[in-house]
Amino acid sequence: MTTPIKRDKPWLMRTYSGHSSAKASNELYRTNLSKGQTGLSVAFDLPTQTGYDADHPLARGEVGKVGVPICNIGDMEALFDQIPLGQMNTSMTINATAAWLLSLYVAVAERQGATPAQLQGTTQNDILKEYLSRGTYIFPPQPSVRLITDIIAYTVKNIPKWNPTNICSYHLQEAGATPTQELAYALSTAIAILDAVRDSGQIGAEGFEQVVGRISFFVNAGIRFIEETCKMRAFGEMWDKLTQERYGARSEEMRRFRYGVQVNSLGLTEAQPENNVQRIVLEMLGITLSKKARARALQLPAWNEALGLPRPWDQQWALRMQQVLAFETDLLEYGDIFDGSPVIAAKVKALVDGATAEMARVQEQGGMVQAIESGYVKRQLVTSHTERMRAIERGDLKIIGLNCFQETEESPLTGGKDSGILKVDPRAEREQIERLNVFRAKRNSAEVKAALANLAETARGGANIMPASILCAHAGVTTGEWAQTLRDIFGEYRAPTGIDIPANDDSRGAKAVAIRAEVTKTGEELGRPLRLLIGKPGLDGHSNGAEQIAVKGRDVGFEIVYEGIRLTPEQIAKAALEEGVHLIGLSVLSGSHVEMVEDVFNQLDQVGLKHLPVVIGGIIPESDARLLKEKGISAVYTPKDIDMNGIMVDILNLIRKDHDLQPVAVA
């Protein structure tokens, strides 16, 4: 009889999901759990993430698009119907409104009969990185740090199995961070948060080691999987040293670097999307091969996320990738296969040294909060991302199917009637608003008023925000009401854009110089310099593309008007009129491009700029691209369009066409 081989326990397996409505998302969750998924990872829509109810004007077109809409406890109960929260491990990707969504989760668990002490899961709750990448911040940095701190202090005392914050290097990589910058900025964020918890006085010295032990990280894993393995080993080394030396953590268990992963979604391509399958598998190796640095939880994107929302079958495929690696291979039968490798050791040391030096530069500015407020970190990320995009454009950084090996057969994966993606029913927004109105009509308005008054008093007075928020959840307060109460007290914030960086070397190349000459010449023909407005309408905060267009446009001679994210169509039209721009470039990655274009055109018409050429970039299916052009969009750009010089020539010629000038060709 053969002795069974001893195998390590697999990581927690999740798929990041949520769309349309709480009911539809609940059905998806229960289906995924039946297929062997071992935890939930909830995606919320943008209004929920930024603190708006579904009927707010800024929520138009965004409801249910990139996640599930949660306006109140009724939605939260529907989301977890037949899912016992006392037995589930739930990760919630939520930041600015994390205190609110956790309060709703606790309230629903209590209604199910569970106690807070039974709950297991994670709130992302890293608002600092929102100022640098995803853009779903609401309040200024200092009040945001206070909210993060309150959640940590509350959960350590009351929900001891909860991970109150996921310090995110994931989004930093997608915003352009190198591995060294990922390490430095994530650990600098952890320092800022742990220092704030300690300074708040909510946790005594005797309990602070428990705080350290509950800090977790959410990490990206890119295609260079050997380097990614080294990055994770460097994270572990640096965290162990930091928690011992700065925070006096003695327990090895409390110092353990605890992290979950989603592999690189923005590295997936629209061109030849079938190649994304092997990309995802290789990226998974970077955070599973090394036992000492293995992820504790993993969620894989679907192969088609560069095209749009994945279907249930696509999410099943992503889950099966994890299961094959964990249960069919011999990965979990061995110790750390990288121990003793001089190559790995040297790479880890180089990453540690580089990250330590960058952390020192952050601390010289007063810490991570101050380095964000000054724009320093954002400029570093925009610079790194610009260098990466230029390397792809030149062909130095090869992306199969995008800038090399572009010959291809037609893919059967995208040949069906649905073009290989899930499309949210346009009725979802209207139906969510109807449910919200019914909920408001049935609740006790006096209880709501009292709960909001208590919340406001708590926010002003400095007490922990969680108990008051849980009372709000039970009273029937809505997401928009909770957030607006805090907006009235803390104010709102606009983060630095980071585009004020030195010109890239490519801006001095022959093609860029030739484009700049034509831009200057056209400006002289029209009597003033050419001016572009780059606009981010709606609630989508993914600004990488807009920033790169702004930087490139500036480098080839255009004057750039870019005021950052979350603009209303009215603000865009007003800025176009006041700034006298020649063309508007819109960026929308949330799937709400049709609604946003309609609203922007309506506003341009009202200010007398109906003639103004407008282009758009984003994750836009071909069928939608045709529709947008029918509505008047001059050009549509998607992630496969990497020739930035070519885009600049397109823009120049659209301006010339608008003024009855002949197009120019730039060699």
Provide a role label for each language-model segment.
Residues M1-E228, R246, E253-G260, R294-P301, ...:
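Catalytic alpha/beta active-site cores
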Residues L652-V666:
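The C-terminal output helix
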